[in-house]
């Protein structure tokens, strides 16, 4: 469950290391985001010579959350850290690689490019 002021790791090679959620997109009263949701983030920590720099405001897709994700078959999946992948205005990933596993719930939200770049889909 991601809300405003939540810090997330960045799971791609865009150059950002840590971001902070500043808005959950999808309705004026929407409070929480989960896997597959698009949020607006501010870059809080970045590496030198990356594609993004500290202070940039971008969109991101949440790919891992610590909160339990319940599946229709009754199973539950949860991750150790909250993580997101930066995207541009055309909903394409800014980076060219994705690090770590991503859940298959991203497929239902039409983030196929992220699924195809990920090394493991749970």
From Swiss-Prot:
PROSITE patterns referenced in this protein's UniProt entry, alphabetically: RIBOSOMAL_L14 (PS00049)
Subunit structure: Part of the 50S ribosomal subunit. Forms a cluster with proteins L3 and L19. In the 70S ribosome, L14 and L19 interact and together make contacts with the 16S rRNA in bridges B5 and B8.
SMART domains in the record: Ribosomal_L14
Keyword terms of this UniProt record: Ribonucleoprotein, Ribosomal protein, RNA-binding, rRNA-binding
Entry function: Binds to 23S rRNA. Forms part of two intersubunit bridges in the 70S ribosome.
InterPro entries: Ribosomal_uL14 (IPR000218), Ribosomal_uL14_bac-type (IPR005745), Ribosomal_uL14_CS (IPR019972), Ribosomal_uL14_sf (IPR036853)
RNA-binding found in the keyword field: yes
Biological processes, Gene Ontology terms: translation
Organism, scientific name: Rhodopseudomonas palustris (strain HaA2)
GO molecular function ontology, one term from the record: large ribosomal subunit rRNA binding
SUPFAM superfamilies noted in UniProt: Ribosomal protein L14 (SSF50193)
Cysteine-cysteine disulfides: none
This protein's record includes keyword Nucleus: no
Family of this protein: Belongs to the universal ribosomal protein uL14 family.
UniProt name for this protein: Large ribosomal subunit protein uL14
Gene that this polypeptide is encoded by: rplN
UniProt GO cellular component terms: cytosolic large ribosomal subunit
């Amino acid at each position: 469950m991601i809300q405003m002021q939540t810090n997330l790791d960045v799971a791609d090679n865009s150059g950002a290391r840590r971001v902070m959620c500043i808005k959950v997109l999808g309705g004026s009263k929407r409070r929480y985001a989960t896997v597959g949701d698009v949020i607006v983030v501010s870059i809080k920590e970045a590496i030198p010579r990356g594609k993004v720099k500290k202070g940039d405001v971008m969109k991101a897709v949440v790919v891992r959350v610590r909160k339990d994700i319940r599946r229709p078959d009754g199973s539950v999946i949860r991750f150790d850290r909250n993580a997101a992948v930066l995207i541009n205005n055309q909903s394409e990933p800014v980076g060219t690689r994705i690090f770590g596993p991503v859940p298959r719930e991203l497929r239902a939200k039409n983030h196929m490019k992220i699924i195809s770049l990920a090394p493991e889909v749970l």
